[in-house]
Amino acid sequence: MTRSLKKNPFVANHLLKKINKLNTKEEKEIIITWSRASTIIPIMVGHTIAIHNGKEHLPIYITDRMVGHKLGEFAPTLNFRGHAKSDNRSRR
């Protein structure tokens, strides 16, 4: 279910402050965050944000095509290693 257009997109305050500070200094630096629920807004374009996936922080470069999506969409949390092999030889 999408967020109402009457409301603004959710962006964590600490993340917004860090991005605004880097934009005023015109610096590029990796921003570490745990806020997977934050929406990507246009002022984030061009920054690299390290998003937590539950184990480590994955650095993601933000492009203009990502605007409107959530940060968590780009850092998968599950690591599928395939289905278990059938072990018929050990049963014999």
Swiss-Prot record:
It is found in: Plastid, Chloroplast. Keywords: Chloroplast, Plastid, Ribonucleoprotein, Ribosomal protein, RNA-binding, rRNA-binding. GO terms for biological process: translation. GO terms for molecular function: rRNA binding; structural constituent of ribosome. SUPFAM superfamilies: Ribosomal protein S19 (SSF54570). The keyword Chloroplast applies. PROSITE patterns: RIBOSOMAL_S19. The keyword Ribosomal protein applies. Signal peptide: none annotated. It comes from the Eukaryota. GO terms for cellular component: chloroplast; small ribosomal subunit. PANTHER family: RIBOSOMAL PROTEIN S19P FAMILY MEMBER (PTHR11880), SMALL RIBOSOMAL SUBUNIT PROTEIN US19M (PTHR11880:SF8). Belongs to the universal ribosomal protein uS19 family. Protein S19 forms a complex with S13 that binds strongly to the 16S ribosomal RNA. This is Small ribosomal subunit protein uS19c. It comes from Helianthus annuus (Common sunflower). The gene is rps19.
